[in-house]
Design a protein with these regions (language model features):
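GH16 jelly-roll
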Residues: 3-4, 10-16, 27-254
Length: 254
């Protein structure tokens, strides 16, 4: 499928109905929650046998079942990071959708836990799509993105589609090349991304990135602006809320 591609071998990584939902806007965590996630450092992040395998085109419809062959629930935390703990118990597979949850928790290691799902293997140039409904609430961040980092022996390259719960009338397009953030822009949507499901996408070429909303081109990044990421990355879906250092960006958690 190469509706908007400019390179002949244009792959499509498409995900089906994907709903990001914050539970009662970061409600208190129930006491019966699953055991705490593991502490991780850069050398001991979750890995699998497909970690350096480049994946091919796929269309995945989340429909009530956890496909462990192709997906991995994150269940770890960084001890010295402003990011939350990632807990497998906050990734829910419903009959016709995936739901990710973020919650407050009273523990010694993190104040907030979020849900994250990773696609196994690595993916490169192509079109990435997600059909999703973002989570409302100040402090929440709903995202689909590609990512790699030093734990995989790579530079920090990343391409983001993000929604801040404090203002869901805008989409945040953003990317990193070799650890440097580039091209951060907030794109008006003309609707509230938490009210209904929409199709969001980006097309990643060696020399350009294009972002789409409901198949409408809304932003383009070119190397004349900043360097384009080149390293293959993991495909990630997550919902989170950060610590104090993130408040000026994402808002005060509800």
């Amino acid at each position: 499928m190469a509706r908007h591609g400019r390179i002949p071998t244009f792959d499509v990584w498409r995900i089906g109905v994907f709903v990001l939902m914050a539970a009662v806007f970061l409600a208190a965590l129930a006491a019966a929650m699953s055991p705490p996630p593991r502490e991780m450092d850069a050398a001991s992040l979750p890995r699998d046998t497909s970690v350096r395998q480049l994946g091919g085109s796929f269309v995945h419809q989340f429909a009530g079942k956890y496909d462990e062959t192709n997906w991995l629930k994150s269940d770890f935390y960084y001890p010295n990071s402003d990011h939350p703990a990632w807990k497998a118990g906050l990734v829910h597979f419903k009959r016709d959708r995936l739901e990710l949850e973020v919650r407050r928790q009273k523990t010694a290691y993190k104040a907030i836990a979020g849900g994250e799902l990773q696609r196994r293997g690595f993916y490169h140039f192509g079109r990435y799509e997600v059909v999703m409904q973002a989570a409302p609430g100040s402090g929440t961040v709903s995202a689909m993105f590609t990512h790699t980092h030093k734990q995989f022996g790579d530079p920090h390259d990343e391409i983001d589609i993000e929604f801040l719960g404090k203002d869901l009338t805008r989409m945040h397009a953003n990317y990193f090349t070799d650890g440097k953030q580039h091209g951060s822009i907030y794109i008006p949507l003309g609707f509230d991304a938490s009210k209904q499901i929409h199709l969001y996408a980006f097309e990643w070429d060696p020399d350009e990135i294009r972002w789409y909303v409901d198949d409408r081109l809304v932003h383009t990044a070119r190397p004349s602006d900043f360097p384009i990421p080149q390293a293959p990355g993991r495909l990630m879906l997550h919902l989170w809320s950060g610590g104090r250092d993130q408040v000026s960006w994402a808002g005060e958690p509800t």
